[in-house]
Swiss-Prot record:
Belongs to the CinA family. It comes from Clostridium kluyveri (strain ATCC 8527 / DSM 555 / NBRC 12016 / NCIMB 10680 / K1). This is Putative competence-damage inducible protein. Coiled coil: none annotated. SMART domains: MoCF_biosynth (SM00852). The gene is cinA. It holds the Pfam family CinA_KH. It comes from the Bacteria.
Length: 410
């Protein structure tokens, strides 16, 4: 069956909130083998919403909406759906009871006012309870068309979809679509695509497609099959070949992040780590402590931004700073050695650079970053040249640092 997603809310069109519901729903539908052909956003306008429903059902069998279920006057998704299917709105007493109980749990007094509209549904609807909010969802099935109406807040949308929508749609599922994602760092998108171009160009089931993210590149392998086991058997040989081609540049898979991969490596191999950051301003430490249990390996992080702090906290020599400047390989070395010695760790990583938007010179332009790496007595320095905003430069330097440590201890 063909499906599409229609998100309702002027706040999305204005860019006030990020629409994460479409991404979540698309992934879940793929797992059911239901293809998504269109995604749309419409403001809080009943006529435009009605127009979108008319257009959508001309080309799709299933439309899933999010948003527009609240108590205010501009929350009109159910009303518009009822109009489209020519059904009256009827009060569901169970939903009204649950609505009143929700208010009671929150310590608020209930009054019908606009609130009661959340307990009205198009006649004949399948109702989805909402224990995380006040607005239940519903589904309307009519002449082979299905309208699924969900609340807008993701904390309400996701559990409702998993608990009620998936069981409803499983009977319409024709197999599944399963994806496996390889996460890649250290290769540009074009260089990576060139290496794996035969898979991208010639594969049909599974298909292989690259996507550039802010911090890394992902390579998605997608298979269609009758069941998950069959899909995974199609994905596995392709994954093996891709890993052979890309080697150490593949650092993880699916939703695993670089800091999680590095954290596991450090703990499994018995390494301890400390970091001395200047231009990255604590981003390395912040990333590392995202991984639960990292205290077994990560001992200390110091943000030494000024020259005085580099001298006092890390033991960087004043003569080194005077001769080479703070942004130099020499200072990066002394920072890495200093933090490893003062923290008594196997590894010390340091960053010093010019993140901009000011401070660059022809000799030391904006985006120049030096990483220092002390690893059990061995010291190395890496020079990076990044483009972009201050934030982008700092994030890229952080990812480079984490990846460099990973490669050194593999």
């Amino acid at each position: 069956m063909k499906s599409e997603i229609l998100c309702v809310g002027t706040e999305i069109l204005l860019g006030d909130i990020v629409n994460t519901n479409s991404q979540f729903i698309s992934k879940e539908l793929a797992n059911l083998g239901i293809e998504v052909y269109h995604q749309s956003v419409v403001g809080d306008n009943p006529q435009r919403l009605l127009d979108e429903l008319k257009l959508g059902f001309e080309r799709s069998d299933i439309i899933i909406t999010t948003g527009g279920l609240g108590p205010t006057q501009d929350d009109l998704t159910k009303e518009t759906g009822a109009k489209f299917f020519n059904r009256e709105l009827v009060l569901d007493k169970k939903s009204l009871k649950e609505l009143k109980e929700h208010f009671n749990r929150m310590g608020k007094s209930y009054s019908d006012g606009n609130n009661i509209k959340q307990a009205y549904f198009p006649k004949g609807s399948t109702i989805f309870p909402n224990p995380y909010g006040t607005a239940p969802g519903c589904a309307i099935e009519d002449k082979g068309k299905i309208l699924i109406v969900l609340p807008g807040p993701p904390r309400e949308t996701k559990p409702m979809f998993k608990n009620y929508v998936i069981p409803l749609l499983k009977k319409y599922s024709n197999g599944i679509i399963k994806s496996k994602t390889l996460r890649i760092y250290g290769l540009g998108e074009s260089a990576m695509a060139e290496r794996v171009s035969p898979f991208i160009e010639n594969s049909t089931n599974p298909t292989v497609a690259p996507y550039a993210k802010e911090e890394d590149i992902i390579l998605r392998i997608t298979a269609r099959a009758a069941e998950e086991k069959e899909a995974l058997s199609l994905i596995e040989p392709v994954e093996i070949e891709l890993r052979k081609i890309l080697g150490v540049n593949v650092y993880g898979e699916d939703d695993v992040k670089m800091e999680e991969v590095l954290g596991r490596l450090l703990i499994d191999k018995g390494y301890t780590l400390s970091c001395a950051e200047s231009c990255t301003g604590g981003l390395i430490a912040s990333k590392l402590i995202n991984y639960p249990g990292i205290s077994k390996a990560f001992k200390e992080g110091v943000v030494a931004y000024s020259n005085e702090a580099k001298i006092k906290r890390l033991g960087v020599k004043k003569d080194t700073l005077d001769k080479y400047g703070a942004v130099s390989p020499e200072v990066a070395k002394e920072m890495a050695i200093g933090i490893a010695e003062t923290s008594n760790t196997d590894i010390g990583i340091s960053t010093t650079g010019i993140a901009g938007p000011d401070g660059g010179t022809p000799e030391k332009p904006i985006g120049l970053v030096y990483l220092g790496l002390y690893n059990r007595g061995e010291i190395k320095v890496k020079e990076l040249r990044h483009a972009g905003t201050r934030d982008m430069i700092r994030k890229r330097a952080t990812m480079n640092a984490l990846d460099w440590i990973r490669r050194q201890i593999l």
